[in-house]
């Protein structure tokens, strides 16, 4: 237990009765200020303090993937920095990479509030945000300005979604339009067709719907940027296998497994903010309830591809043990979001230090050696 878990987290979660989205918005304003004011003494001092407290630098954690250098395997998942306003800050928190978005071609407000709920009894969150963001053109300007201020020191992914106003039959143009605006600014790109919070979006996981999207993006991808697809944990095995086959046909760089689940296997009986039972609330569940299924999906994909298609594992990672399990199942990289909210800013450091201890115990020289070994 650290200061965050003992003091700040209980205060934010219960005592202040703070709306989770309001807290998140305030945090992002602070991070955006740090990013914009990198030349100011106060911001510089805070960045140095964050880095010295939260970063772990050890070559045994590093790897090269898709021609990119990852200092460590822990990344910030999409959904946290939706508009890319703090891209220079995330390494200071210890992350080896980060993924911004989900961003859509058209700016959109997302779904009505309240739309984000904590489920502490389950170490989970329920969200139905609906891809609220300022749009791809706005993100391009923000990231360009950030790069003018400071060279990027780590890989940045950009997660692309479909605009709500765009009909499903025009999805290809919507995704390609966002990619055209942003392809200069991302080190890798993710096709998000698995959020449960945009009507009809998950239907784009069907091979006949997904194939033209991937083909359109790859036709525009003249620089060969790594392109991945993010899938839902609720798919049947045959559907996952079909997506894996399609990914290989279209020469995707990898798969992100997994997004949030629409299943409601929870301890939480009623959501405090609404008084409703979880089954009455729309949205996806993230955090601990997704842990086991996401690991199973990772293991399935790794076996299906004989380890030839890199996987970014996400879902229910709170500890070094959780991270180790997903790496052994076949994930080359990992992402966190809900666990970071519950465990606090020291979580990444604790996970990395725990992985190094485990490597020492197992006689492992390089962390990448354990990928897919169990």
Swiss-Prot record:
Pathway: Pyrimidine metabolism; UMP biosynthesis via de novo pathway; orotate from (S)-dihydroorotate (quinone route): step 1/1. Substrate binds at residues 82, 127-131, 192, 197, 259-260. It is an enzyme of class 1 (oxidoreductase). It catalyses: (S)-dihydroorotate + a quinone = orotate + a quinol. It is a peripheral membrane protein. The active site is at 195 (nucleophile). Keywords: Cell membrane, Flavoprotein, FMN, Membrane, Oxidoreductase, Pyrimidine biosynthesis. One of its GO terms (cellular component) is plasma membrane. It comes from the Bacteria. Its cofactor is FMN. InterPro entries: Aldolase_TIM (IPR013785), DHO_dehydrogenase (IPR050074), Dihydroorotate_DH_2 (IPR005719), Dihydroorotate_DH_cat (IPR005720), Dihydroorotate_DH_CS (IPR001295). Pfam families: DHO_dh. PROSITE patterns: DHODEHASE_1, DHODEHASE_2. One of its GO terms (biological process) is 'de novo' UMP biosynthetic process. Its EC number is 1.3.5.2. GO terms for molecular function: dihydroorotate dehydrogenase (quinone) activity. Binds 1 FMN per subunit. It is found in: Cell membrane. PANTHER family: DIHYDROOROTATE DEHYDROGENASE (QUINONE), MITOCHONDRIAL, DIHYDROOROTATE DEHYDROGENASE (QUINONE), MITOCHONDRIAL-RELATED. Belongs to the dihydroorotate dehydrogenase family. Type 2 subfamily. Catalyzes the conversion of dihydroorotate to orotate with quinone as electron acceptor. Monomer. This is Dihydroorotate dehydrogenase (quinone). It comes from Acaryochloris marina (strain MBIC 11017). The lineage of its organism: Bacteria, Bacillati, Cyanobacteriota, Cyanophyceae, Acaryochloridales.
């Amino acid at each position: 237990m650290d200061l965050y878990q003992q003091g700040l987290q209980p205060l934010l979660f219960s005592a202040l009765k703070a709306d989770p989205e309001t807290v998140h918005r305030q945090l992002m304003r602070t991070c955006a200020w740090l990013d914009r004011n990198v030349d100011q003494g106060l911001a510089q001092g805070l960045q140095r303090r964050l880095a010295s407290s939260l970063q772990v630098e050890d070559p045994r954690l590093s790897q090269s993937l898709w021609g990119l250098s990852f200092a460590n395997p822990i990344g910030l998942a999409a959904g946290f920095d939706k508009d890319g306003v703090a891209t220079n800050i995330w390494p200071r928190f210890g992350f080896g990479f980060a993924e911004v978005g989900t961003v859509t071609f058209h700016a959109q407000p997302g779904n009505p509030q309240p739309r984000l709920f904590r489920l502490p009894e389950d170490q989970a969150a329920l969200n139905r945000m609906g891809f609220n963001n300022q749009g791809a053109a706005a993100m391009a300007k923000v990231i360009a300005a950030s790069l003018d201020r400071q060279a990027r020191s780590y890989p940045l992914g950009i997660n692309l979604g479909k605009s709500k106003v765009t009909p499903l039959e025009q999805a290809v143009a919507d995704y390609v339009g966002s990619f055209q605006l942003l392809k200069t600014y991302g080190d890798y790109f993710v096709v998000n067709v698995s959020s449960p919070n945009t009507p009809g979006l998950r239907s784009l996981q069907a091979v006949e719907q997904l194939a033209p999207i991937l083909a359109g993006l790859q036709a525009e991808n003249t620089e060969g940027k790594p392109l991945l697809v993010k899938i839902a944990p609720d798919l049947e095995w045959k559907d996952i296998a079909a997506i894996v086959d399609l990914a290989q046909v279209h020469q995707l760089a990898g798969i992100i497994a997994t997004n949030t689940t629409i299943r409601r296997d929870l301890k939480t009986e009623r959501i405090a903010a609404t008084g409703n039972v979880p089954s009455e609330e729309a949205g996806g569940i993230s955090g601990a309830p997704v842990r086991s299924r996401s690991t199973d999906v990772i293991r399935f994909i790794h076996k299906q591809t004989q380890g030839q298609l890199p996987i970014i594992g996400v879902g229910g990672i709170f500890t070094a043990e959780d991270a180790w399990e997903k790496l052994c199942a076949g994930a080359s990289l990992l992402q966190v979001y809900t666990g970071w909210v519950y465990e606090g800013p020291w979580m990444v450091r604790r996970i990395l230090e725990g992985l190094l201890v485990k490597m020492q115990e197992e006689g492992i020289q390089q962390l990448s050696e354990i990928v897919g070994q169990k």
